[in-house]
Regions:
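Positively charged, solvent-exposed patches that mediate nucleic-acid binding
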Residues: 1-114
Length: 114
């Protein structure tokens, strides 16, 4: 995922947590916030949160790679900041299910590009 499509600063994550809307399913929570008007046509940015309850660093990084790769394939409206928070049940999911659950959340949040 290109750098301009990633959320990197903790300030951005805090803004989304405070002012964003949320949707969830059994494996993920999606937080989304529309960006300022001057960024309305900019590509949407993604962030990923996995707590230490998920597992050790190797396991968390494996799931993060799968989530990043799945997010690359999502067709999302421009001008949004989106954070995916993995729940502990992510252990029950394989890559195809991760992709499907993330896609369903984006669709349910009405963030899918036309």
């Amino acid at each position: 995922m290109q750098k301009h499509r990633r959320l990197l600063k903790s300030k951005d994550f805090a803004l989304i947590r405070s002012f964003g809307e949320s949707w969830s399913n059994k494996s993920f929570v999606l937080l989304a916030r529309k960006r300022d008007e001057m960024y309305a046509e900019a590509p949407s940015r993604f962030g990923f949160i996995l707590s230490k309850k998920i597992g050790n660093a190797v396991i968390r990084n494996r799931f993060k790679r799968q989530m990043r790769n799945s997010a690359n394939g999502l067709d999302v409206k421009p001008g949004h900041d989106i954070v995916f928070i993995a729940r502990n049940r992510i252990h029950e999911c394989d890559y195809k299910e991760i992709r499907r659950f993330m896609g369903k959340l984006v669709f349910g949040a009405n963030l899918q590009a036309e």
